[in-house]
């Protein structure tokens, strides 16, 4: 049990997808203007990562890994296309659910909801799972933790950006300029976790 708690804390803080690996920056910067919208996208990313990482773990270990289907057959060259296909299917299902049951959130996320399909944080989580050879339970914990870490980062950035609307930012830094500086400072803060051994 300690191993799973350690993996969860590590994936949320120490190896944060957004602030340690800088994955998923497109949606991270574009949707982080309001806390409510960024929280909704964060929940969507948590759901997709929590499902996509373990499902792709099963696909990899039962189908794509060397000697998984047939002795001597290695289908690992199909990793990228298969993982992206699974992620795309999951995002489409999530999009239909949000459209049906949460129309305001669906409209607020707009084009960024289908872009979760190509969000490199999702694909990065799946790739790290394969690279680190996680079992199914570890992949569930890692997917959930990575999603929560990404959501924590985007909600924190949105909160800071909402407060910055009322501050006196120099004209040359308004917009993305001050946002990049803010993200850099947040990343420095998360770097302080890098020395933690779990």
Curated annotation (Swiss-Prot):
Top-level taxon of the source organism: Bacteria
GO biological process: respiratory electron transport chain; sodium ion transport
Membrane topology per record: Multi-pass membrane protein
Pfam families, A to Z: Rnf-Nqr (PF02508)
Record-level Gene Ontology MF annotations: oxidoreductase activity, acting on NAD(P)H, quinone or similar compound as acceptor
Enzyme Commission no: 7.2.1.1
A GO-annotated cellular component: plasma membrane
Family matches, as InterPro entries: NqrDE/RnfAE (IPR003667), NqrDE/RnfAE_oxidrdctase (IPR050133), NqrE (IPR010967)
Keywords for this protein: Cell inner membrane, Cell membrane, Ion transport, Membrane, NAD, Sodium, Sodium transport, Translocase, Transmembrane, Transmembrane helix, Transport, Ubiquinone
Transmembrane segments: 11-31, 39-59, 77-97, 110-130, 140-160, 176-196
Compartment(s) where it occurs, according to its Swiss-Prot or TrEMBL record: Cell inner membrane
Catalytic activity: a ubiquinone + n Na(+)(in) + NADH + H(+) = a ubiquinol + n Na(+)(out) + NAD(+)
Function per UniProt: NQR complex catalyzes the reduction of ubiquinone-1 to ubiquinol by two successive reactions, coupled with the transport of Na(+) ions from the cytoplasm to the periplasm. NqrA to NqrE are probably involved in the second step, the conversion of ubisemiquinone to ubiquinol.
Similarity section: Belongs to the NqrDE/RnfAE family.
Cited NCBIfam families: nqrE
PANTHER family, A to Z: INTEGRAL MEMBRANE PROTEIN OF SOXR-REDUCING COMPLEX, NA(+)-TRANSLOCATING NADH-QUINONE REDUCTASE SUBUNIT E
UniProt subunit comment: Composed of six subunits; NqrA, NqrB, NqrC, NqrD, NqrE and NqrF.
Name of this protein: Na(+)-translocating NADH-quinone reductase subunit E
Native organism: Vibrio parahaemolyticus serotype O3:K6 (strain RIMD 2210633)
Name of the gene this protein is made from: nqrE
